[in-house]
From Swiss-Prot:
DTDP-4-dehydro-6-deoxy-alpha-D-glucose 2 binds at S193, W288, R351, Q367, C368, T369, N372, Y373. GO terms for biological process: antibiotic biosynthetic process. The gene is evaA. The lineage of its organism: Bacteria, Bacillati, Actinomycetota, Actinomycetes, Pseudonocardiales. The keyword Disulfide bond applies. The keyword Disulfide bond applies. This is dTDP-4-dehydro-6-deoxy-alpha-D-glucopyranose 2,3-dehydratase. Changing E404Q: Loss of dehydratase activity. Gene3D superfamilies: EvaA sugar 2,3-dehydratase subunit.
Length: 471
């Protein structure tokens, strides 16, 4: 008879892992890094942009290389079958309109990208302070081309070199990671308005290695990154998403609702929405028209699909063509915030989007493109939109313009805000007051907090973090 060997057990970390939380808070409180001053980062980004050859040009769909409109479906696909496709989506909401649109039923083009990409940031301690390795990365859709991205930002097609390009630098730290060095590892969804069930693996991995420092990389503290988040179009969407998942310590462990109550409310929101979603051929999408250079809504609202030719001398592949999605106008993304019994709370909405895996995710108080509602009476516009747009400067606690993921979106930008709320606000159905700490806890699990809320959460957490016993 063979003997059974009992495996050794490992200690289970509590939800608030104080070692990491204290080190993260110290990094957030440190605004002097070992490599460069925060005020020099923008000049360094500009220098990296000037040191390389970057060019993005809009082209007709007919000039796309390796992309074509499939004969039967009309879907816009890559000949390799990899990367992503532009398809159609048919959404029916049986319980009322939600998301970024006033209608109970609609059809639209959508980006379908089944591959799970890696968004990985490498962390290392210098002089007792955690620093994070950021990359000055060119993306064709960035309004200013180069922004600070994660150490690794790559689809499976990229890091397996389906494009025939060079290796993705430092991918070995993330695929697979050393389990003893993982700080963050969670699948998070991307924009449910434009993607169909798209997720990326958000990761932060610590190292003690001597990591090569290429010209397009720099080590920054969390405090430096927090300062840069106050500047327009500097920290890219993927970096913001990953950093929002950091396990900050809850320094005010009280809230209007307990964690169990919050999860019960959220589960009820997911359960009560009856949303039917199915993929359809792009050629069958109603209400949209396709021309030689654009696919657009017949009323000029929402977004467009177009094509670009790209050159990027420091990319794994130095030239290529691809489709991109372009929004029709500047978006608005805002949290209303108030103190309840001295504890800051933000007003979240349980938002329905056709592209979400689980129908509903927690979103900012307001998340929309106002132009899409300009033709509607006030009562049909999103709740709190007018309040946010007309907020006096004295109530605005945070404001910056951030662009969305430049690998799929062309110049898509939103005005991100945190605004002091009127104490008398009573949340309507589908809205709830929660603490930033409760949202942070939920980012440890996928498909709870949407990507727009994660951006604002990253800004709020970095500004508020303090080491235990700190000032």
């Amino acid at each position: 008879m063979s003997s059974f060997v009992v495996p050794s057990l490992t200690a289970v970390r509590p939800r608030d892992h104080h070692d990491y939380a204290d080190r993260i808070a110290l990094s957030a409180a440190t605004t002097d890094g070992v490599q460069m001053r925060t005020e020099d980062v923008r000049a360094w980004i500009a220098e990296r942009r000037d040191a390389n050859v970057f060019h993005v040009e809009r082209i007709p769909f007919a000039d796309l290389d390796q992309w074509w409109f499939e004969g039967v479906t009309g879907n816009l696909v890559h000949r390799s079958g990899r990367f992503f496709t532009i398809e159609g989506l048919h959404v029916i909401e049986h319980d009322g309109p939600h998301g970024d649109g006033p209608y109970r039923e609609w059809q639209q083009p959508v980006i379908r990208q089944p591959e799970v990409g890696i968004l990985g940031i490498l962390a290392k301690e210098f002089d007792g302070v955690l620093h994070f390795l950021m990359q000055a990365k060119m993306e064709p859709g960035n309004p200013n081309l180069v922004q600070l991205s994660p150490t690794v930002q790559a689809t499976r097609s990229n890091y397996t070199k389906a494009h025939g390009g060079t290796n993705v630098k430092l991918i070995e730290y993330f695929a697979p990671p050393d389990p003893e060095r993982v700080i963050v590892d969670v699948l998070q969804a991307e924009q449910g308005s434009w993607f169909f069930r798209k997720s990326n693996r958000n990761m932060i991995v610590e190292t003690v290695d001597d990591v090569p420092l290429w010209d397009d990389f720099c080590w920054l503290t969390l405090g430096q990154i927090a300062e840069l988040m106050h500047e327009d179009e500097t920290i890219n969407m993927n970096s913001r998403s990953v950093l929002s998942c950091l396990p900050y310590q809850d320094i005010t462990p009280r809230a209007l609702f307990s964690d169990v109550q919050l999860l019960s409310w959220f589960t009820n929101e997911r359960s009560r929405h009856d949303v039917r979603v199915r993929r359809i051929p792009l050629a069958d999408v109603c209400g949209w028209k396709q021309g030689a250079e654009e696919i657009e809504h017949e009323d000029g609202r929402y977004f467009k699909v177009l094509a670009v030719a790209v050159k990027g001398s420091n990319r794994e592949k130095i030239s290529w063509t691809q489709p991109l999605v372009e929004s029709v106008d500047l978006g608005v993304v805002a949290f209303l915030v108030r103190k309840i019994d001295g504890v800051p709370h933000v007003l979240v909405q349980a938002r329905v989007d056709g592209g979400f895996l689980d129908t509903v995710e927690l979103a900012p108080t307001v998340q929309c493109t106002p132009l899409n509602y300009a033709h509607l009476p006030a009562e049909e516009r999103p709740p709190f939109l007018d309040l946010v747009q007309n907020a006096p400067r004295s109530r605005i606690r945070y404001e910056a313009i951030h662009s969305e993921e430049g690998g799929r979106f062309l110049g898509v930008r939103a005005r991100y805000l945190v605004i002091d709320a009127d104490e008398a606000i009573d949340p309507p159905p589908g809205y709830a007051w929660v603490t930033p700490a409760q949202l942070t806890a939920l980012t440890r699990h996928g498909h709870y907090v949407n990507v727009e809320a994660r951006t604002l959460l990253a800004c709020i957490n970095a500004a508020a973090a303090q080491p235990r016993g700190g000032a």
